[in-house]
């Protein structure tokens, strides 16, 4: 009995481990795992179904087929446990040992492991310093390799063909040795002395000048060091013994009809064994060399196929022409071991069904069909039935449940009470896709879902299905209730705004009841209290929308929680009073006393959560919903065709637009405007017409004229159903109403360019055939886009989660005082995001001081909450330095001060919060809402008619920001820089508006001038790109030959001639090399220089440019030399939507990036090469640069427009040539903060366009993970190699140690890695391997003998432990503490202690 108990105890024990190591297996190790050698290719006997002896399923090697039974049947049952049968040699034990016992195959000739050979970079190749081609020629018996040169002229590792080998034999006899095949490779690897090689390379690297050589050496050095330190031996990459997988992991299952279903591995193993046995026989027979060689090659190929089929040559196929699934295929890919079984598992105790709406539920409830509940809670019911004595055995209980006896239902009610269940809707894009509810039993078969959680699940009731899961353990129930309950998830973790917000019909009801109607029944009545109002309303004495006065009490809650009440008489409507009755105390009346559109309702719920508290908010949200449904039913709003009133002005507007278009067509016909200009202008006209129609239509729908009490006509907001739907935010938008009642407007072709002829009809009038055909393009593209988008968005989320999964809040405070400077986002005349919104929920890094004094306004370490935001807005502060995840100095994880507020809870983030995963989900979840399309410039024109001037909105002072200007004779400024901006500051000096000023714009004000609202301060022609002269002088042409490089055109109407530069493609061969340009000369014909420089005033003219001046004309400063039609100058596609977000996170370099100044200094131009210009920057202080030169130079293609002139001063990181920014350059030249700002702003732009709110800190969290690695620039006394990529934390740790010992620390440069690269470069090989490129990651990890400390979430999921985040953090901290205690207590244990412990254990086990 004791035996049995011990056996059971040993079965249940879990091994505790702290890390996992992966390394190469030596032949001895493989033999030690093995339980015997597999010698025959047979599997099982097809008559008796018994495994063949010494075959692939042999019971002697792998264990018995049936529990406690040997193969021949001599020993059966438990009592013979552990005996080895003398007849058949099988140990009597559990059959499940066939899942863990391995065998082996002794190979007759060594075989190279294909992973270390072919997975790039080839490890064997690096080690032997040979190319992969050469090694393959040796391995597959095409040439000899010299393994021991002896005293000859040959070198070790030299390849010899057959002829060369025989010649060498004749010449040197047996002075030297040359071999072929894997043995040769093995011999070469044995000969390597790791230590001396490492020493040699370490000395060689500093003495090498060529970059490529250093790269090669440091790669090889890294590999050699890895072998040296990990204890792996290089020759183990060639196998002499092949392990055999346990048979139950490659099963052979008999099907009916005498056929077998088998794992592909068995076929692959059979080939290996067959070839191996044949090779053994050939060697015994001393067969001719050529035959043996062929057999060895075939063995090598068979083993290759077993390990990784298809990696080399053609994949071996089975009987059905399908490639066989090798060991490598088992672990990689979506269906592989990692992603299918370790990271994604099926869940027991779950069910799924269609969802229907449950408008009567409370927020924390869901309706669960009785049938489902009975099935899901079966074990609980069984135990209750037994406990009550209603059933004697489980079997009897089962019977009762199957018969559905009455008592079972009573027990089910009890079991379910206060037992939450989890509801999940696929796709689970963020953590709100799984929430906990208390089940309410219902009849029927559909799950009832509370309407307010639909937006979190993104669910609708058109046939969606949801899954139910039952948390079994008490801990799971507790977590479900405390963390996952729908009532605890009011705020969205992405933006911190409420996500439990009424939508659609509820909004419509609340909006309708809070509207005013002039001259409704009971208008002007005065009531004593709210009760009287509802009595009057329900007895039909007063209308719901009537304006009345009522006396009510308003309670307000201050910042410290103190309550103040005030009773007053207020002007309001009946509906608003009814709504006021359900509003919790503490909410001001003015939040309710207005038409409740969706935004207003959201604001009330948000305020309620922040000020009144969670419980009140939940109750309030529920009551809002009930009331909304009630009144939307009473409103009886519906749509008829006549609700879409077509504006009277429409015909007139369209006629005017048509006339304008005709005008432009005639201009085009007579050659006054180019094709591109015509296209742009036409589209502009129609965009404007469309907007006008829409405006007049909305004016018609949104207002109605009524007679008021005094019999006078008065305008009020209309009660048109369509208008109410759109205005309340319930459904539809002005853009959709425009298509129904205005005009459909311009349509896009499938490639995104806009068709010139708009659809003038609307849906109420109906489309004709042509119009319908045009509009099908867009509809189809929309559907195709959606399908592609979903997959792309899912992949982006997966990469984001993978890169950020191990980022958890571990510390309270890392103590840093660095951070990011936050300022408001201003575009054009609007503040898009105020400073308050940006810093809400952040911690201030340093004291904010009032400008011009030393008064501290906000002390460092303050968490900015809503109250502080109000104060900061009043103080007129322009920017605040806040702590950020990017600058957090915690070694692993992140501290809660740098992260700030937990957005979903509204207080400071708790240690253990998995902020990385939350960030990834918040960015990935709205991915499906982003567009896939790339906007062409034409598309941009359609979105807004092209801007051609800057009109100021409010009064203020002008600030010109990095604009270079020249002033023309009229005294106006002309902008000659491309990235200039003009800002307007208000009286207190805060920036309120900001506009981009394009090249060639006329600026009519000076810097610092005061302007009034509505004043136009700059204007330009939006359809052409000018080239502006910066000096006055005489025009001299060069490279302008008529008919070769230019074409003269004379206008019939005006008689003016213009010159057009031909595109090189259109020129005759003689003109191909001409470079048309204009030089400005003085009266004597000498070249003029640009002001204060020695750069000639020389303008290259691009193709398609149009000149209106002639050779010898005299021009002034600021005059336009040439115009380039806008479509002619290179229009860059603006990548929008999802691809743009992916590009930013992958840190991709754009095609033609902006060129930045690498150092600060003076610009000059060197000798030009063909097609390139040489830009030279000389440091002003004359210091010598790192590489020893006195200046920095870069070659820039001629077609790039430069923004700097000779002699100009540039600062490091300033733009020299325009283009999209390259994030790597920003990091290198401007630092981490500039990079963070760039990436955050760019990504926010994309999301903002779609109206998605995401908090900046999620993006910063991902950027932190992208900045984990550094590149070593100088080694110092560290163990790092120059040019090596290392984790930042490990460099910091090593440098600390070196400084403590007074040695030289290593210097490094921060690196920016794309999210895919960063995921693959994590410390943890388990996490990287389960992400992508499994083979490569595992190969590298094995060679370097990597140890995975299981720090992240993914690794712990894979090994099946609690994750070190959330509630699992306590378990991990506890284990850490126990480990430390154990280390400190490792003092000897006496024999008596052991004995006492044993007796104690036995006692407890017997009892």
UniProtKB/Swiss-Prot annotation:
Mg(2+) binds at residues 460, 462, 464. Gene3D superfamilies: 1.10.132.30, 1.10.150.390, 1.10.1790.20, 1.10.40.90, 2.40.40.20, 2.40.50.100, RNA polymerase II, clamp domain (4.10.860.120), RNA polymerase Rpb1, domain 3 (1.10.274.100). Its cofactor is Mg(2+); Zn(2+). GO terms for biological process: DNA-templated transcription. GO terms for molecular function: DNA binding; DNA-directed RNA polymerase activity; magnesium ion binding; zinc ion binding. Binds 1 Mg(2+) ion per subunit. SMART domains: RPOLA_N (SM00663). SUPFAM superfamilies: beta and beta-prime subunits of DNA dependent RNA-polymerase (SSF64484). Its EC number is 2.7.7.6. Keywords: DNA-directed RNA polymerase, Magnesium, Metal-binding, Nucleotidyltransferase, Transcription, Transferase, Zinc. Belongs to the RNA polymerase beta' chain family. The RNAP catalytic core consists of 2 alpha, 1 beta, 1 beta' and 1 omega subunit. When a sigma factor is associated with the core the holoenzyme is formed, which can initiate transcription. DNA-dependent RNA polymerase catalyzes the transcription of DNA into RNA using the four ribonucleoside triphosphates as substrates. This is DNA-directed RNA polymerase subunit beta'. It comes from Cellvibrio japonicus (strain Ueda107) (Pseudomonas fluorescens subsp. cellulosa).
